[in-house]
Amino acid sequence: MLKEINEQPSKIKGLLEGQLTDSGVQEEIFGPSAPDIFKKVEAVQIVACGTSFHAGTVAKYWLEGLAGLPCSVEVASEFRYRNKVVAPNTLFITISQSGETADTLACLSAAKDSGYLARLGICNVPSSSLARESDLVFLTKAGPEIGVASTKAFTTQLVGLLMLTLILGRHHGLSSAAENTINNSLRALPDSLDSVMLLEDQIIEMAEDFDQKEHALFLGRGIHYPVAMEGALKLKEISYIHAEAYPAGELKHGPLALVDSEMPVVAVAPNDDLLAKLQSNLEEVRARGGKLYVFGHSAAHQELSLIHISE
């Protein structure tokens, strides 16, 4: 798993090559019929499981915030068993690392005759059932993922979903300036991830604080909430430590009652505005003897155990 974590910069660099050109993201990377389909999209439905569901939830913020498209994200094991109302010209998206997740494939099959505009599959395995059965396909090119917990597949899924957002945004009023800014951020992403890999010693030190803990809370606001969800899932999967994720503003609505010196609180807040909003949470956690760990950009808040990540 550690090997696959460290492969993320190179895998994302390889994914972007040839797909993000000087003129932007090429629509044809999703399939030859993609340009005709994408210009008709009026809504998006995303269905996935586990880590892929978290990637889809991040994409919801992008699709609604950048492309102005209503987007719903659901767990496949729930979505497949309920009655659905399909809005006109809805793009149906499934996400799966293996392309063989049973519940996700069942939803993909049912969507064929449910009135969706088209079915887009995002996966890592070209020969998978999901890739074969979808109308459009985006391959994440992360390479074989042997680790039990998804790492490089998750981040390459996010890159693919952001590129999709940029394409759909072109058809729904996203400015060229905004698109160029995001394109430049994508180009810089491999180097930014390289800098994150240099935090290994600090992360090991943090992990030692968790060694004897039995519970943990993960917090995030907005688009960072699903990232917190992914962090909690990883701690459960790999460390067998119970962890839950909450929107940061919800800490006082129940979870705070569980915080004590034996429950660390991890916050995902990679910008100064969100970090400032955590000050009241810090005081509440401290009052109960807990410790707050923050993944952020600012070193201004010395009271926090800050894991500094590049912007």
Task: Please place each PLM-identified region on the residue numbering.
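Short alpha-helical basic/polar micro-motif
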Residues: 3, 233, 283
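Glycine-rich phosphate-binding loops that contact phosphosugars or nucleotide phosphates
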Residues: 36-174, 179-188, 268-307
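Flexible, low-complexity linker and terminal segments
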Residues: 1-7
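A short, hydrophobic C-terminal helix/tail in secreted or cell-surface proteins
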Residues: 309-311
